[in-house]
Amino acid sequence: MPASLKELDRRIRSVKNTQQITRAMKMVAAAKLRRSQDRLVAARPYAAKLDELLQGLAGTSIDHPFFEERELRRRLVVVVSSDKGLCGSYNANITREAEVWLKAHAEADVENVLYVVGRKANDYFKRRQWPIDRAITDLNGTIDLERFNAIADELMHRFVEDEFQEVVVFTTRFVSTLSYQPTHFTLLPLKPEDEEDAAEPAGASTEYIYEPSAEAVLAALLPKSVRNRVFNALAEAFTSEHGARMTSMGSATDNAGELIDTLTLFRNRARQAAITQEISEIVGGANALA
C-alpha cells in the first residue's frame, strides 16, 4: 500500500478516535446540563416565596449593615468561570467582560481585588497580574448548596467586617441550551430598590402578619436573600457552562464526521489511482512481452 494511503488511514483512525471522545463529552455535558436545569427549577419556588416576603417588607425601614454604604476603599470583584475548558467562548466572554469593567473602574483611591471561582478565570487573571484575593478551583461545575452558602457567608462576613466596602459579581446568565449571556451585579451593599424589585408582581399579593416584628423578619431574611442571589449566580453560570460544552462538543463531533468523510474520499481516490497505475503497468509489461 502506498505511503500516502497509509498516512490517510492513520489520519482517519486518529479523527475517529477524537470523534469518539467528543461524542462522549457531549453526552456527559448533556447529562450534567439536565441535572443543573433540574436544580435551578427546583430552587425557583423557594426563591419566589423569598422574593414575595421581601416585597411585602419593602416599605419597612431597618438599620442593617447590608444596606450601609461606606466610603469605598476596596472593592471585591467575584468572577465565576469554569474549572475545565472545551466549552467554546464561555470563559473568554466572562473574563473579557470582567477585565473591561475592571479597567473602566480603575480608580486611584479604590483597590479592586479579585475573588475567582473557576480555574480558567484564575489562570486568565494570573497571567495578566491582577491581584487575586482567593481562588476556588474545585467545584467542577457542580451545584453544591453547602459550598455555595459557604461562599455567600464569607462574602457577607467580609463586607460586614469592612474588609471590602462593595462586592460585585460577574457571572453568566443561562438563557437556553444554545444561549447564555455574561452579566454582573452589585451583591453588597444592598439597595432598598434591589429588594423591592426582587420579584415581579404576580396577581394579588398575600398579606402577612410578622412576628415578633417586620423589622426582625426582614433582618432574618436579608442573609437568606444574599445566599439566594449567590446560589443563582453560581448555578446559572454552571448550567451555562454545561450548555456551552455540550454545544461545543456537538460541533466538534459534527466537524470530525465531515473531516472523516473528506479524508475517506481522498483515500478512495488515492486507492483508485494506485490501482489504475498498477493495471497500466501490468498491461504495459504484457504488451512489451508480446
Predicted segments, located by residue:
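C-terminal beta-strand-loop-alpha-helix "lid" module of Rossmann-like NAD(P)-dependent dehydrogenases
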Residues: M1-A290
